[in-house]
Amino acid sequence: MDLLFLFFSLLLSYLFFKIWKLIDSKQDKDCYILDYQCHKPTDDRMVSTQFSGEIIYRNQNLGLTEYKFLLKAIVSSGIGEQTYAPRLVFEGREERPSLQDGISEMEEFYVDSIGKLLERNQISPKDIDILVVNVSMLSSTPSLASRIINHYKMRDDVKVFNLTGMGCSASLISVDIVKNIFKSYANKLALVATSESLSPNWYSGNNRSMILANCLFRSGGCAILLTNKRSLRKKAMFKLKCMVRTHHGAREESYNCCIQAEDEQGRVGFYLGKNLPKAATRAFVENLKVITPKILPVTELIRFMLKLLIKKIKIRQNPSKGSTNLPPGTPLKAGINFKTGIEHFCIHTGGKAVIDGIGHSLDLNEYDIEPARMTLHRFGNTSASSLWYVLAYMEAKKRLKRGDRVFMISFGAGFKCNSCVWEVVRDLTGGESKGNVWNHCIDDYPPKSILNPYLEKFGWIQDEDPDTFKVPDAFM
């Protein structure tokens, strides 16, 4: 009897040990954001309303028709007059970009952001175990990742990934790479650098679908420190809860809706097709189908299913009520309350229409979409790094409290929709905001005035006649 008791005691002890080891090992696989640093270019790269006019008027390929189109586009874009452009635009060389222009633009970003991030956290570049760099429209040899390693003299065994061509959703792809590495390697520190090089891709032709990108995309970038070190968990800002990636590259319509291309004159630019909203909506819906059960409580999912069931029964009884009679392109509401599982919504700043569309679909109010709106207004569409400017706005406004969940939603060429949820590890209301990119202007947002500076300065163009129009002397 004593032997039997001893046997079962040992067996139970072994089982408890295995369970403890399993739980303990999972803790080492968690992905935390330790800190992040958004890039604020120097003020001499700020695109004022006046300078926007100078850029447009010196393009000899444009006429009054294109001016009217651009005015309408920039007014409806939601962008303000304090965004940043590449340095070569201010030097008047946008028609003759060089490889060095693109590299210099990226060097200015990573020297600033990575340098500040490592210094603030008292981390040596040699402590970095994993480096992931994503810049879609610049591919150099050696890679940008290699240039960062060379500049900061990182270790020989650092694991390196250099992503190109992944579009505006690339930063979450970079985070996903880090997350998967953390599953296999414990006690690691990762650095993600996300940006976009606009210098080689500033379009100087007159194709409307390509010149539209000049109105939306602006310079920016972000460096993010991630870790699965147990000793750093209490210092972390966010913990990754889940991530879902959707790729519709197999669909021709989605694949071709936004693409880097040449126009008929051979000028390189970024094409934004009219079917882009449709492709984005389709990818977003597919993504939501997968991530929703992962992030919302069971009670809300049951309520939603019952609501759908009742609706289907009513439609069967009266088919005429099943028609929505909505105009084409109108975003549909998901019909589910995402606020039951999410406190904050970090939306990609692809444009005013993108933000409004997601806000409508998820039934968000003005408070929810304010961070994305203000980021678009202040910094423009900074491509893959835009999500982090939105997150920084929330932090600067002291919205992020311990236990809150942040839903990140991004879109990118391919066509891709990537989303993830972060849990706030501790109240973010104090010293961690020292390097926040919004610190210098957060009290000015939201702005009291809603007047559009572009409409005020260039609204007269709409009344001009092609036969009598003349470029004002102020822009010659």
UniProtKB/Swiss-Prot annotation:
Gene Ontology biological process terms in this record: fatty acid biosynthetic process
Tissue: Expressed in siliques, flowers and leaves.
Signal sequence range: 1-25
Xref: CDD domains: CHS_like
UniProt subcellular location: Endoplasmic reticulum
GO cellular component labels: endoplasmic reticulum; membrane
Family: Belongs to the thiolase-like superfamily. Chalcone/stilbene synthases family.
Protein's name according to its UniProt entry: 3-ketoacyl-CoA synthase 12
Organism annotation: Arabidopsis thaliana (Mouse-ear cress)
Gene field: KCS12
